[in-house]
Amino acid sequence: PEYAERALHTISVTYQRSHDEKFGGILHMLSDNGTDEQYKDWNAARHLKWDEKVWWTQAEALCALLTSADRTGDSAAWEEFKTLFLWCREHFFDPDYGEWYAVLNRDGSPRMKLKGGIQKAAFHIPRALYQCSCILKKYVAETGDCDAQT
């Protein structure tokens, strides 16, 4: 139980510090106090900037936030999940060809049109969304409510 409480607390604090209040989504890299001061040119070799939105981070955050909401019943966690899910659907998902873009600019526009590559395959996004759908199905089965939280 102690580890579970720590994990759920970490999810909440991490989301609160990394959520981009100006444009939405999760920022790629921040310092441990939630600022960008030390990461202006972070990971230049991989061509990722601190303020970009990376598919993997968003997908894992969706799973973590929904798991936290499910385990705690915390309405704030439900709202954080819903906010991030709707943002991802609007910005990452390509309605014409499916799948998510790999990297977005800070404002949510696609930085590149790629949807696959060395590190991004057609596994993580379906797995994350499937995991979320399982939690949501469980919630609906237990409560009969498909509108209140999500």
Q: PLM ranges: what are they?
A:
Residues 1-150:
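Glycan-recognition and catalytic cores of secretory/periplasmic carbohydrate-active enzymes
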